[in-house]
Amino acid sequence: MNRFFATVFALTVCACAYADRILLEAEAFECKGGWKTDQQFMDIMYSPYLIAHGMGNPVENAYTSFNVGETGMYDVYVRTYNWTSPWHSGKGPGAFAVGVDGKRIGVTGNTGDSWAWQHVGKAKLKSGNHKFFLKDLTGFDGRCDAVYITSHKDDVPQEKCDAGWREKLNPRRTTEGKFDFVVVGGGIAGMCAAVTAARLGLRVALVNDRPVWGGNNSSEVRVHLGGNIEMGANKGLGRLIREFGPEKGGNAQPSSFYEDSKKEYFLKAEKNITLYPGFRAVGVVMNGEKIASVSAVNIESGDKLMLSAPLFAHCTGDATVVVLAGADWCMGREGKDEFHERYAPDVPDFMTMGASVQWYSVEGKEKFPEFKYGMNFNDSNCEQVLMGEWTWETGMNRNQITQAEQIRDYGMLTVYSNWSWLKNHSDKKAKYSDRKLGWVAYVAGKRESRRLMGDYILKEDDILKNVYHEDASFSTTWSIDLHFPDSLNHVNFPGREFKSATNHRLLKQPYDVPYRCLYSRNVNNLFMAGRNISVTHVALGTTRVMRTTGMQGEVVGMAASLCKKHSVLPRGVYRSYLPELKALMQKGIGKQNVPDNQNYNYTIEPEKR
């Protein structure tokens, strides 16, 4: 098993011309205590950050060491964000203290209305080593991007705070790698693409921006697998998922349900895969209409990768990097006139399915603080429940990429505000007196953002009329399942809905989706698998569930092996080697005699196998 072991270390001393200008990246702190690394919004703010996600209980301190070159008085700035400011004009709940060598300098995180550098105080520091700490005061998701310590008067750090400025202060090392196939995104689709290609002889790099594998099916998000496997024209597809798929179904369940270690073992067993967990893809280098290499950054150390290959697959969902490559894409809902879809709106718009912040409570007597930061609950509009799963969905009328942090934050705001009402004010609060929050997601479970355009765009008629295509590949079996704001929630919170509903349009039989939906129409060496494949918004309602995206990944891995074998690009497989691809899909790549453990959460009765 080839592995890249990123040496995660904190470069806490500014490596620039002035030893008295020091940038401490929070995600690189030597000890994070109870703070979590949050990389979800790097495309917008250029950096991960630490978040104190304690569900109302302060988390353990984070700290790191740094060196001062000259004794003197230093100003201390913290880049932070008062996360409830879009809904509440006063101080927010995310307060935390900062200090040096055990002495508090100031409190921050609960004022302002955007990510910004806040001056928290001064500290007299002697030359030599010191220890900087973050002390959470509330447990309500205070966040710290970076700390800037300077002895220069009026040396306020750059507000833009982009990667170039950070790199100048803290240079990072770059590691290069050459592969046959680079897969970006370690969810179910990316895992299946990487393993399939590796078993067919390709040297594969698999890049994932979280430390755990499985994407929405990991213990960080906790969405169960959905859809049927081993059905349709190519019954060999899907058996691979038996090898790593959790045996239990259910959303928002205890972490053990999602079997993170099983997924990791599944990947580590493949000698042809080099794993890069904790690396976020941030850029591309192009060679004409092909990707030459992808760059990625470690979400803790800041170390960089440059991975080159003749073939790439993007399986991240948002597809930000390949948009930088110029790949054609769309987002939102097509109007009826474009594809004559019955379930499309009359005119196109930017509405998407939302992102879920799931949660549950457990037994335990614990007080919960008053949480009033812009959500006004009462007994007529609150949710009198002990848990919230996929229906706790936000952001359907917001941009799922540029407004992703606010969408996630609004999800957390509603959970905390509702729970505070139930615990402290509800007429039925006695029912909740022996309950406490057991888990609230801070990694949002996205359903939809960008969709990349391939040589074919799957639409509603293809599915409902069972239109045959010669390049039929993976089968989609889930209903056309399109989410929209819940009608009662809309009445109670117009324009600020946090609950969703759906109408399932059941499929009568599996539908075999064209292979041409799995590669880009204008970036010639780019495959895609996952919720970002070439489909309309309506068609995405069926193709987006995770067993189905896993089979998409299998097809991509098989096609990549044929690209290498015949020295062609993805389109060349369709034009010249379709029979060979069909043979691979019918045979499958999954191991034989693996127990059939995936008999939950499907909408078509499984075939006996």
Give residue spans per PLM region.
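Beta1/beta-strand and adjacent pyrophosphate-binding region of the FAD-binding site
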Residues: 175-187
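Hydrophobic h-region of N-terminal signal peptides that target proteins for export
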Residues: 10-18
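Flavin (FAD/FMN)-binding glycine-rich loop and adjacent Rossmann-like elements that form
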Residues: 171-175, 189, 216, 278, ...
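Extracytoplasmic
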Residues: 20-173
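Sec-dependent signal peptide recognition
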Residues: 2-10
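Residue-level detector of alpha-helix initiation sites
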Residues: 187-188, 212
